[in-house]
Swiss-Prot record:
Disordered as annotated region, ranges: 1-69, 552-593
UniProt biased composition (Polar residues): 552-561
Name of the protein this chain belongs to: Putative ATP-dependent RNA helicase ZK686.2
Cross-referenced InterPro entries: DEAD/DEAH_box_helicase_dom, Helicase_ATP-bd, Helicase_C-like, P-loop_NTPase, RNA-helicase_DEAD-box_CS
Record organism: Caenorhabditis elegans
GO cellular component: nucleus; P granule
EC identifiers of the protein: 3.6.4.13
Residue positions of motif DEAD box: 377-380
Function: Probable ATP-binding RNA helicase.
Gene3D superfamilies from the UniProt entry: P-loop containing nucleotide triphosphate hydrolases
């Protein structure tokens, strides 16, 4: 009886734990138990054989292992095993970005506004060349004019403007500055405008001259490496300006100079930074901390004493064509309750970057829809010849060719001059040119005396050249932002423009990948130029290469290849930048013995 009862107990225990014939049956049986024994009737008809004690224990171990593998419960922790979970990036949308004022990036009759739509101060006259307001101007100017007519009692809100190249951003701060200066002469410095390159300084000064009335009430001074430092200092001392347009390095040089009198920033009303993305990540250590310190009132909330003395922090206006991609970096500018004016994706080539999105504006660049892009793929040894054929085939009047290195510009200029004899003039513009030589060369190009201008990226930012028909990337740009800035030299103010990029099969692969990631590939046309296409020009091309080889060999013997281009104007000397290391000499107290 005892053995019979043990057998019955064993049968009862094994009704729910029948070992199947194959390995997959373990999982089937576990599923059956989990589902509430729905198939009890069919299983009950089967007769289970008695199991030995060792078999039961082995079956239990298998069940534990399978259960742990399925993630239902973990019996033992496996040493060295780490469970990783993919977490979604936290997306934060700043309120000032979410409430941005948008405008169309396309300039045409449907988006432009009549001049009567904006009421200008009486002392400002509209130049005859301007017939309408562009979208960015119509969006920004009314609010800035209102603050000038009715100044807020406390610190005004700062402004960030993200608009495509050639959309008319410069007027968005030129007119408010002239309105703040007023119609009566004064010796108060109202605005400081900072730009990254010398050529842009001269361009902005010319824009002020266009809008300033005949009496010239507003005194505008340019400070850059194109002028002699001591001459600039004497000009500042004899006739204090209302507006300063400068490069950051030259402004710091004047602010820290021992030549009296110093520039007074205590009553500054506008601090404007054009092409802000070009200023670099060390701009705060190099010059921004110094300017904010001398302005005063930027590190604390305005108090009653500041209101009585009419001393307040200046209003910052930050502009760039790629500003919307660098929304995170705007924190470096220490903007006060900023207002964002941004181009919309409607009627514009919207370029969404592949970087993680912080908000709905970050990661976007805008390129005018009037620009067409073509990618020419050929062997590197035929690149100069491909550029020559593209220029002559399309009959461009003004062509800007971008290169990455100075040596490339010299070689390409020599070859194109040989190929283009008796057809058109070719010249090259690099950062090694100083003083008047820069402006003379740009003036010749604007007057169409030079049909082709080879340049480095010193002209890729902000510089407005007259009616550039085509931009050629002889060396492909390293990133999408540089591509947008280069392309922005053509197709300005709603005009048609063409961009031609030249590369080989290897560089094409990386370049196309970059454009597709940022949705810049779009309507790009790809053209393959095989060797037989160049046969008609091969004799002239061979002679040009022989001439280049002889010139390089001659320069190597005489050392001429190492000589820097002859400079005119003042002799520029590179100085160390102590502030780049985070030093702030203006904060150091003078020690008394």
């Amino acid at each position: 009886m005892k053995r019979k009862n043990q057998k019955e107990d064993s049968d009862t225990e094994n009704d729910d734990e029948i070992e199947p014939a194959n390995g997959d049956g373990i999982e089937q049986e576990m599923n059956r138990v989990t589902n509430g024994n729905e198939d009890d009737e069919s299983v009950g008809n089967d007769v289970a054989e008695p199991m030995e004690t060792e078999d039961v224990e082995d079956s239990g171990e298998v069940e534990i292992e399978e259960t742990a593998q399925n993630g239902e419960r973990e019996i033992f922790k496996v040493l060295g095993k780490q469970e990783m979970k993919n977490l979604e990036a936290l997306k934060v949308t700043s309120s000032w970005v979410q409430n941005a004022t948008t405008f169309s990036a396309t300039i045409d009759s449907s988006t432009s506004q009549k001049l009567s739509q904006i009421e200008l101060p009486e002392h400002l006259t509209v130049p005859s060349a301007i017939s309408t307001w562009f979208p960015v101007q119509y969006a920004v100017l009314p609010s800035l004019f209102f603050e000038i007519r009715s100044p807020p009692p406390l610190r005004p809100r700062d402004v960030a403007i993200a608009a495509p190249t050639g959309s008319g951003k410069t007027i968005c701060y030129v007119l408010p500055v002239l309105a703040a200066v007023g119609s009566k002469p004064s010796k108060i410095l109202q605005a400081v405008i900072l730009v990254p390159v010398q050529t842009l300084v001269a361009q902005i000064v010319d824009e002020f001259k266009r809008w300033n009335d005949e009496s010239g009430v507003a005194k505008v001074v340019s400070l850059s490496g194109a002028n002699d430092f001591e001459k600039e200092a004497r000009q500042l001392a004899s006739d204090p300006p209302n507006v300063i347009v400068a490069t950051p390095a030259r402004l710091v040089q004047h602010l820290t100079s021992k030549i009296p009198p110093p520039i007074d920033l205590s009553k500054l009303r506008f601090l404007i930074v054009d092409e802000a993305d070009r200023m670099g990540k060390l701009m705060r250590e190099e010059w921004l901390d110094l300017v904010e310190f001398l302005c005063g009132g930027m590190e604390r909330v305005a108090c009653l004493k500041d209101i009585i003395r009419q001393r307040r922090a200046p209003q910052k206006i930050v502009l760039s064509a790629t500003l919307s991609k660098d929304v995170e970096e705007l924190h470096l500018w220490n903007l006060f309750k900023p207002r964002l004016f941004s181009a919309t994706a409607v009627s514009v080539k919207d370029i969404t970057s592949g970087i993680p999105q912080v908000d709905h504006v970050s990661g976007r660049l805008a390129l005018p829809s009037s620009i067409s892009h073509r990618l020419v793929v050929t062997d590197p040894k035929f690149h100069p010849l491909a550029v020559y054929q593209q220029i002559t085939r399309n009959k461009f009047n003004r062509t800007l060719i971008f290169v990455n290195e100075v040596s490339s510009s010299n070689r390409l200029a020599h070859v194109l001059k040989e190929l283009c004899k008796d057809q058109f003039e070719v010249d090259y513009f690099t950062a090694q040119l100083f003083g008047k030589r820069r402006y003379k060369m740009l003036e010749k190009f604007n007057k169409n005396e030079n049909r082709v201008l080879i340049c480095s990226d010193v002209l890729a930012r902000g510089t407005d050249l007259n009616k550039v028909d085509c931009v050629i990337n002889y060396n492909l740009p390293a990133d999408d932002k540089l591509f947008v800035h280069r392309a922005g030299r053509t197709g300005r103010a709603g005009q048609d423009g063409y961009v031609i990029s030249v590369g080989d099969k290897e560089s094409k692969r990386l370049f196309v990948k970059m454009l597709k990631v940022t949705n810049l590939w779009g309507d790009t046309v790809e053209e393959q130029m095989e060797e037989y296409i160049f046969e008609k020009d091969m004799d002239r091309y061979s002679k040009a290469l022989e001439s280049l080889k002889a010139t390089v060999s001659s320069q190597a013997k005489t050392g001429g290849s190492r000589q820097i281009a002859k400079r005119s104007g003042f002799e520029a000397k590179r100085k160390s930048r102590p502030n780049a290391r985070g030093e702030k000499p203006w904060l150091k107290k003078k020690t008394t013995e």
